[in-house]
Design a protein with these regions (language model features):
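Bacterial signal peptide processing site
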Residues: 22-24
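Mid-length scaffold segments of soluble, non-membrane domains
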Residues: 85-149
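Post-signal-peptide N-terminal segment of Sec-exported extracytoplasmic proteins
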Residues: 40-73
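C-terminal motif of bacterial Sec signal peptides marking the signal peptidase cleavage site
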Residues: 17-20
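Extended, aromatic/histidine-rich regions of cofactor-dependent oxidoreductases associated
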Residues: 172-206
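Acidic, glycine-rich flexible loop segments
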Residues: 136-173
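Bacterial N-terminal signal peptides that target proteins for export
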Residues: 1-9
């Protein structure tokens, strides 16, 4: 018996249409998504062409566009910074096994699907002698869809102690060691594992 393909093609086209329209975003959310996508395109341009990119260091890694989850506004949170009264200097490991000293500065909190989570904010010193602040984390996607060592979020300190920060996991990124073995990067501690699949931000490169 001969089966017509027309109904199947029609259903396939409908499913593609529904897939592209699966979420109803507000105009503000759509503007945010466009901003994230623009940022990602600019980062690809940097990674491909800039001399400081890991893809141009010793020419050992071939560039290809970075992989991401689709931007998802539900992975954007607000939190103040809760500074630790005693800011301990602790030792962490780099991916090549070397010890590094870092200050456990404070933490941020967020709620997802009615569950509370916490991530530490660390203070370090760059090679140029500049202070920097960062969040390093692993989650349920680590070693699967995302880089096994973990991912990072930059953190810009505001002098106002009551300032409300935006914690945007759509901006979570891989450290350079995810692309090239020439680099060593900080390994997130077990304390900074969140029992949640953070399906936002950058995916595994390899």
């Amino acid at each position: 018996m001969k089966v017509s393909l027309k109904p199947l093609l029609f259903l396939f086209s409908i499913s593609l249409f529904l897939g592209s329209c699966g979420k109803n975003y507000t105009p503000e959310q759509r503007k945010y998504i466009e901003k994230v996508e623009k940022y990602r395109a600019e980062k690809d341009e940097y990674m491909k062409n800039d001399p400081g990119s890991p893809f141009n260091y010793k020419g050992k890694v071939h560039f290809k566009p970075l992989k991401y989850y689709d931007p998802d506004p539900s992975f954007v949170f607000k939190s103040r910074l809760y500074q630790y009264e005693k800011k301990d200097t602790i030792k962490i490991l780099g991916t090549k096994g070397e010890e590094r000293k870092i200050v456990k500065f404070g933490f941020v909190k967020f709620n997802f699907d009615k569950k509370d989570y916490k991530l530490n904010v660390y203070k370090g010193v760059s090679r140029d002698g500049e202070d920097y602040y960062s969040i390093w984390f692993t989650d349920k996607t680590s070693g699967k869809q995302t880089y096994g060592v973990g991912r990072y979020l930059d953190f810009d300190l505001n002098p106002d102690s009551s300032y409300i920060y935006t914690i945007d996991f759509n901006l979570a990124y891989n450290p350079y060691c995810a692309y090239s073995p020439e680099y060593s990067c900080a390994v997130p501690s077990k304390e900074d594992h969140i029992n949640l699949a953070v399906e936002a931000g950058e995916k595994n490169f390899h």
